Curated annotation (Swiss-Prot):
Residues 295-298, 479-484 form a propeptide. Hexamer; each subunit is composed of an acidic and a basic chain derived from a single precursor and linked by a disulfide bond. Residues 208-233 are annotated as: Disordered. Residues 35-253, 311-460 form the Cupin type-1 domain. The lineage of its organism: Eukaryota, Viridiplantae, Streptophyta, Embryophyta, Tracheophyta. It comes from Arachis hypogaea. Keywords: Disulfide bond, Seed storage protein, Signal, Storage protein. GO terms for molecular function: nutrient reservoir activity. This is Arachin Ahy-3. Disulfide bonds join C32-C65, C108-C305. It comes from the Eukaryota.
Length: 484
């Protein structure tokens, strides 16, 4: 009898699980059926004291299909983007600038310790604590601080607090993609930033309210609107925070963001600059192009606490695909940066010369979010029915989602078309349809001739005329052979 009862309970769970999966599939089955794709620009900008954040509408069908959310932020001189964490893994590409960032991994020890006064091992500006003897105050200890520079890709796991700071005169410009459809996101597919400091607008909240995801005019909606703009600590009572942190109410009020100036926002300006505890060789390495790719680990076996969280894929690095007449492409996946396996993401950075082409190809196992960094390119995308769902110029500042298996090709309209593509698989693979070692290249000649109704010489040309793998130089520099 007990066994029958256990089997019945197990069967009920299986039915419920299957029902929930079916329900999710029914809700998502039409999200990737497009008659037309659209290049998107940000439609919201949130100004702060030290910079601004631009966001794209995550309710857009293309973003829903890819399971991603896109934003772009700019940090001015001495600007600090205050700590936050997200409900989904993210990748951040540094298009411009340099500075420092930190990730706070729960349970990992602080490995950076402030030196005893007078030590020259580390360099940081001196700080003065009112009413406290400098010799008696505790030394600062915290988790690792990382340097970043132009071209770096930063991996930020879900639920891990992140902050970033610009210590240079050049603005930091960064593009961020959240993988909202990740298995690590146990909430719905909507992007959420959990701010840990300040009192600012949640960058994606307005889209959530527009989509009607919240309870209609109910108690829950009123409560969320009442708390809009607060950080995580704002929702806790003064008593709880005072007890939890063992501090007085004056400190708690700042923790809750009660003494904020309206213009401060998510990005604040640090007067006199931030006091950052980092080894001096880091500063040197990030002032010299081509250096600074390593995190200066101490040889300890890599765990989540010591994991490498960034890799440079910019212009100064060696390319995976290179043609001096056409351009270059650099990729990063879990084999290059193992932490990407946890995120389920990878990335690609490309530079294509004017009139050169990235041949028709498709992503075998990932959706792709392309962001045009500089210049423009004529892009065509084709769906499973052979319909051209995109046939326009992708311009600087625009983004384009290319769903998995949709074929895509691009021809640069600028001296150098620069782009970054974020992909929803930690080991994303592409298959080229034309060129050397492509689908066409590897078909038997007879199959080509009979599949496309060609003479054998024509089939041979279709297979072999393009000796390039992915990037093809401008057409006027090539001899195109034809059959009379």
């Amino acid at each position: 009898m007990a066994k029958l009862l256990a089997l019945s309970v197990c069967f009920c769970f299986l039915v419920l699980g299957a029902s929930s999966v079916t329900f999710r599939q029914q809700g998502e089955e039409n999200e990737c059926q497009f008659q037309r794709l659209n290049a998107q620009r940000p439609d919201n900008c949130i100004e702060s004291e030290g910079g601004y954040i631009e966001t794209w509408n995550p309710n857009n069908q293309e973003f829903q299909c890819a399971g991603v959310a896109l934003s772009r932020f700019v940090l001015r001189r001495n600007a600090l983007r205050r700590p936050f964490y997200s409900n989904a893994p993210q990748e951040i590409f540094i298009y411009q600038g340099s500075g420092y960032f930190g990730l706070i991994f729960p349970g990992c020890p602080g490995t950076f310790e402030e030196p005893i006064q007078g030590s020259e091992q580390f360099q940081r500006p001196s700080r003065h604590f009112q009413g406290q003897d400098q010799s008696q105050r505790p030394l600062d200890t915290h988790q690792k601080v990382h340097g970043f520079r132009e071209g770096d890709l930063i991996a930020v796991p879900h639920g891990v607090a992140f902050w970033i700071y610009n210590d240079q005169d050049t603005d930091v410009v960064a593009i961020s993609v959240l993988h909202t459809n990740s298995l690590h996101n146990q909430l719905d597919q909507f992007p959420r930033r959990f701010n840990l400091a300040g009192k600012q607008e949640q960058e994606f909240l307005r889209y959530q309210q527009r989509s009607g995801r919240q309870s209609p005019k109910g108690e829950e909606q009123e409560q969320e609107q009442e708390n809009e703009g607060g950080n995580v600590f704002s929702g806790f009572s003064t008593e709880f925070l005072s007890h939890g942190f063992q501090v007085n109410e004056d400190i708690v009020r700042n923790l809750r963001g009660e003494n904020e100036r309206e213009e401060q926002g998510a990005i604040v300006t640090v007067k006199g600059g931030l006091s950052i505890l980092v080894p001096p060789e880091w500063r040197q390495s990030y002032q010299q192009p081509g250096r600074g790719d390593k995190d200066f680990n101490n040889g300890i076996e890599e765990t989540i606490c010591t994991a490498t969280v960034k890799m440079n894929i910019g212009k100064s690095t060696s390319a995976d695909i290179y043609n001096p007449q056409a351009g270059s492409v650099r990729t990063v996946n879990e084999l290059d940066l193992p932490i990407l396996n946890r995120l389920g993401l990878s990335a690609e950075y490309g530079s294509i010369h004017r009139d050169a082409m990235f041949v028709p190809h498709y992503n075998m196992n990932a959706n792709s979010m392309i962001y045009a960094l500089h210049g423009g390119a004529h892009v065509q995308v084709v769906d499973c029915n052979g319909n051209r769902v995109f046939d326009e110029e992708l311009q600087e500042g625009q983004s384009l989602v290319v769903p998995q298996n949709f074929a895509v090709a691009a021809k640069s309209q600028s001296e150098h078309f620069l782009y970054v593509a974020f992909k929803t698989n930690s080991r994303a693979s592409i298959s080229n349809l034309a060129g050397k070692n492509s689908y066409m290249w590897n078909l038997p000649e007879d199959v080509v001739a009979n599949s496309y109704g060609l003479q054998y010489e024509q089939a041979r040309q279709l297979k072999n005329n393009n000796p390039f793998t992915f990037l093809v130089p401008p057409q006027d520099s090539q001899m195109i052979r034809t059959v009379a």
